[in-house]
Amino acid sequence: MAKLVQSDAEEDGGEIDSRRVHQRFNSDYLEVPNGWTLRSYDLHRGEEGVQAQISIGDERSPVTVLSGRGEGAVGALVEALNRRQGWQLQVEAFDEYSLGDNTEANAMACVRVQVGGHTQSAVALAADTTAAALQAILSAAGRMAEAQARKSA
């Protein structure tokens, strides 16, 4: 984020205000790419890990169901994305935070993923830590897919 803010400040020839920093954060980390919104998820833990069914999409795209298995919810989603996209996506950094002090607190997840030497980062806010983690991975994956599509065009 610091590099992005510094770049904006250099382009504008000076300092930028907190409103602009907030806008940059929203557009570069928090906004969900079209078609990559978490609609629902269903997780089942068994002897072989977590089996996940994750529905994604938005009002502009049909719902897609991703299925995967992993050690946890994030691992299952990564496995499903790798199969669907033909990637070897890896999670390089992952942090979760509670945004409050009680059981009604929202959650925030921050991720950085890598595919073929290229990285994307994303942040997600949700009512629970699992939804925040899944949405952050989906947002980063969506940004990766968009970057690959631009590169191939």
Regions found by a protein language model. Give the residues of each.
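Terminal or standalone catalytic/regulatory effector modules within metabolic enzymes
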Residues: 1-153
